[in-house]
Structures are given as C-alpha cells and as structure tokens.
C-alpha cells in the first residue's frame, strides 16, 4: 500500500513539473553572430609617369649606352616602375640644337644639351656653365664640383629660366683636340681649314684663319667623309672610338686644349617636373648625379685603353705645340674679359666660378703628391 502511494506521488510530481515547463516562457534565442567585416577595397595602381627624353648623342655613342640608357634603367628600378624615361638619340624627335626650346614647349619632358651651342638662346653666359669648347677652361671635375657644391646649378637654372629647370649635369671628360687629314699642331696650320666645332672655340679659331661649321654629332662622320669639313672635334677617345672616326681621318690631335672639359646640363620641362611626386623628383636628381659621377670615372679609366686602340689601328697622333696652346689661352682670356665687361651676368658668373676654381685648385695642389710607387 505504501509502495503504491509513493509511486503515485512520484508520477504526480513528474506530471506537474512537465506541465510547468510547458507553460514557462521560452528561453531567449542566442545572439546572432556578428556580420563579417567588409573586404578592403583593392589598392589603386600607382600612377606611372612616362617621359620623353632626347639626348645629344647618336645611338652608336658610348655615352648613349653608358649613361642615357643606364639612367633610364636606374630610374625605373629606383622608382619601382613609376617613372619611365623613353630615351631618344639626337635628332629623333627634334633637331639636336632645338632641344632646349622643345623642353620649354613640352615636346620633350627632359633633354641633355650642350651649352656651347645655346648662346643664341640665352647669351654668352651659357659658355661659363660647363660648355664644350671653352679653350683653356675648367675641367669636368672642376665643373662637376661647382655644379653640385658651388653655385653652378643655381646659375644654370637662372640663365635658362625661360626654358626649363636644370636638375643635373653630365661630365664627359677632356676632348680630343681634333680629327683631320693632316697635322694641325701650330697656329699657321689652321689657316683656311673648315672645322666643325661649337662654343667659344669657334670664335677663337676664327682668329687663326679657320672657317667654322656647326653641325650635330650625328652628322659629323658623313660630313667629313664627303669633304664638307676638313677637320672636327667631338668628344674624348672613349666616346669617339665607337663612332668610327679613325676610319675616315688619318690624324688625331692631343691634348684637348680647346675643351678641357665638357659638362652638359640636363633640363626638364617645368610642368612635367611639378607633376612628379616629391619622391620621384628626388630619385631622378640622385640618379643623374650618381650615374654622372660613375660615367666620368669610367672615362678616366677607359680613355687610356681607347688611345691604345687608335695607335694599334695606325692613327697618326700629333701634339699641339706649347706656343700654340699658350696663344689659344691668351686669346680666350682676352675674349672672356671683354664679355665680362659687356655683360653683368656673365661677369657675375665668371667671378663666382673663378673664385670657386681657385679654392678647388688650391686644395688639390696642396695635397697632391709628387711621388708615387705607381708612376
């Protein structure tokens, strides 16, 4: 009897509990999982700037491959492909001696030009800015130092203010005095000679009875081969050898008193420059300076080997007499002082550069050794 009551009681409790559970409020639903974060927007591709860059040099020149093409490769690598220089040899887009106007007009974004051919644009001050063809003038090392450590870059940008911005220079070394069909070692040898040259040397040479022709480097070989000119100068031994001048001229003159250094400026269009982000501007400036210094050093090393190529080929090498060199320097100084008297800006640049070179030479002279076990 007791067992039945206990069993009945248990069943009643279970039944009542079940009914209570059924009547209770439902348990709250679990909170929904948070929505996944939206996927990040795809990164926008970096803007790529493509520039047209024309040089002075033809394709066969050592400078074309050794500096200009290397500059394009270096800038592309340093910029991660954001700045592309499309390199063009001289005359491909515009005539060589119209490159500066083309930079001003936006036809070219950048150009490498010889200041010795640009007096008609900006006056005689251009000659002091490292121009090829300034007899007994500054060397490439002096010009390069003045540009980057002195006031050369600022003066260059001032002189060419209406045409673009000067952002660097390329030192190309001392030039060969000339290529010719006969020795031209004395003043008397030059009377009546048709000579291709540029710069102040053209004016000085005229005082010795020569007639001067100004043509681009890419036209020199053909003009000499056809007899349009009797003699010409272009660059140094390393740059000249691939041009094949030894094939058509029997004589080569040394030293290059007419052009101890040829330091060419690199100009950019102002709008193209302002469109570049600051980091790309810096990359281009640094690349030009670094590669310019490297190229200059390579010329110092290779010029000696290139002279041996001329000797092995059979080119007759003559040396300009000391008397003729002294007379060239004397007449150049007279013309320079007259330019300075007539032109205030020329005089300012002349005095500035003269003071810098004096300091440069003073330090170099004081530390130069007279003896070396490598001599």
What residue ranges belong to the model's regions?
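Core domains of carbohydrate- and sulfate-ester-processing enzymes
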Residues: 150-151
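Short, low-complexity disordered leader/linker segments with a strong preference
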Residues: 1-50, 368-375
